[in-house]
Amino acid sequence: MGFCMKDSKQYYKSSIGKSLKRSNGYLKLVLVLYLIMVSWSGYSKEVFNSRTKENINANWLYLEKNIKDINLALNDANWESINLPHTWNALDATDLNPGYRRSGSWYKKELAISNIENNKLYQLYFEGVNINSEVYVNGQKAGGHIGGYIGFTIDITEFIKSGKNDIVIRVDNSYDPEVIPSQKSDFFIFGGITRDVWLETIPKQHLSELKITTPKVSENEAELLATVAINNLNNSNLKVQANLLDAQGVTVVSSVFKIKNNTAKIHFRNIKNPKLWDTEHPNLYTLKVALLEKGDVIDSVQNRVGFRWFEFKDHGAFYLNGKRVLLRGTHRHEEHAGVGAAMSNMQHRKDMELIKDMGANFVRLAHYPQDPEVYKACDELGLLIWDELPWCRGGLGNETWKTNTKNMLTEIINQNYNHPSIIIWSLGNEMYWLPDFENGDDTDKMNSFLTELNDLAHQLDPSRKTAIRKYYEGSHIVDVFSPSIWSGWYSGSYKSYQKAIDTYKKEYPHFLHAEYGGSSHVGRHTENPVTGEGKIQSDGWEEEIVQTDVANIAQIGDWSENYIVDLFDWHLRISENDENFVGNVQWAFKDFGTPLRPENAIPYMNQKGLVDRAGNPKDAFYVFKSYWSKEPFTYIESHTWTERQGPKDLARDISVYSNCPEVELFLNGKSLGVKKRDLKVFPAAGLNWNLNFKEGKNTLVAVGKTKENKTVKDELAINYRFTKNGKAVGLKLESELLENGNYLVTAIAYDKNGLRCLDYEDQVYFQCLSGGETLKSQGTPTGSESIAMANGKAAIEVKRDGKNIPVVMMVLNQNFKGTYLTIE
């Protein structure tokens, strides 16, 4: 399978007519036009429409039945219309009734092909199907694929006919111990055709498997070496022409290369003064390759190229293009509220842009390869990638498991080989945990297979590093290793972080810290976050597999936003001030679904994200932005903490997160002074004030000033009371009309005096009894029928059903048996 073909463009015929007027002026004009065309295309003559690529996401039918036989499936009457991408787990994986479906389903589409060309191959390209699939064309099995998260091609040439063609696909995400990832992984394995599908036509004599390397790169000169396979059915006398174009489309270098053993080696040795690809300036070139027969272009492909080199110094820092770069990273799971893993390209792109806007330069794609749009965005935005084989937990499997796993690694590397953003091929995460097979945690056997994978990765791609996370016994096998450091969450205090990284910098030659952080429930705050001091051992940082006998913040903490803000602030202060540290990778950028966490504040959600599942930033997002982003901003902690209480004249801490050199804070129009930002000071790099609120409404304004004397400001209104609430005696409901026409229904816990109970955290349950429906199963702070209160408050979005009757809402829990609200 030629992964380069997914980015190939169509080339158009450019020829000069033979019946030209022989006037001298006309010949000059023709010559000029010809030279312009040649300089633009690099080719003497191009064949019109040599390749086509058509997106066929629209107008599919879906059958949610686990039927094995295709004929029984086709005769079923329950097919429903859908568009791709699609997952049947979009709305069943979270909330009150998860019903996480792991089973088989069917998809079908009528595909019209008007005229079949005998000199063309026809193929379907699937960007990703979870997790096993069988593809049928006009009733015949054309192929299939084992394993999700990877693109694959099905040649349908011999199965199609002119006119209408029936494409039928069986997809199955059932538990299969022989296919990674393990069911014990802490994320949902979404079933379905979760990415784009394409109909492609290519010439029977064609190019494939374009692999590009840059063996030598410096600021002054670069070398490009590429190989491309040729399918030469007719044993014709073919050649390959290659053009390297810069970002403006100008040809930098061009040459014609011979073909030997159906392979062409493209070698450009002296590319002068290349514009380097890095995280600040992700300069990209384009390599265009044409297959020539007697001077005519019969096929052509193209791929982007980035010139860069990198190095992990032994027991030291990371260098990109000879300059030290601190890896400022996060993790990304491929899912979004309401659609699960069936995200649009726009949603993928928005995720990556938000990560970049935060100031990150590195992303670990966990725990599986992701949509092609993600890699494309990282190439363009300047985000370095850790790409991961989904060997996540489950230990070592049988021989079939091993074959499937090696095949998947091969596919990942071949498919994503040409992306300059990728620097690491990860071979797994927590692989030894909870084996699915007998003796699956045998260290010697694990290491033997890990060595096979490591050798395979280096054989397929000698230019990049291999890595694993949290399998200590195999740390010596791979190039880069991440131990488990969860200071302040699964073990110890966050103040142990410096000791942890100092320990591992000495122990592992190439140490990159992947995964740290903790959960936060949007809107939950406390004046005195639980830090564990005096209750837990402060020096720990390792995450235990079984935590029933472990005291840690994950279990005894309050899940407040302000605790997590402090945790990240401490970690970033350490990493930003350590000159010999490679960097760290926060877990995870966005809240994501998991079958292992039904008891969480939002059921079945891992809430360690810097943004919620819909992409809305939490407080912690702005902590990272203050350390990493260059775009000036200020953010007062916290915009989700607007109701506070405490005794009169008791000073409260206010932190401002900003990347400006200095910030001035105003309370109710009065300046509280200017403070200088100092990255060595905790918290908030010294942008912290003690102040006294008045009773009632208070207005805070933070004004940041840049080095150029430009100002940016943030404003926050806080309602403060001197009376502490008592115990909750009931729940009340309120509604607000939103701009989209829906209602936000909010439940508030109150005491006997009617005060909102800011310390009430119990779970509540929403239900729409008539007149509408809740936007449930979103896994967001306003999209879950079951949710824990945050400072005595919880909400859900409700949509009218169009029947012109009042909306009747109910909220209840074990203590408060039912409160009702009617919205006319």
Curated annotation (Swiss-Prot):
The keyword Transmembrane helix applies. It comes from the Bacteria. It is a single-pass membrane protein. GO terms for biological process: carbohydrate metabolic process. One of its GO terms (cellular component) is membrane. Its EC number is 3.2.1.31. Its main location: membrane. This is Putative beta-glucuronidase.
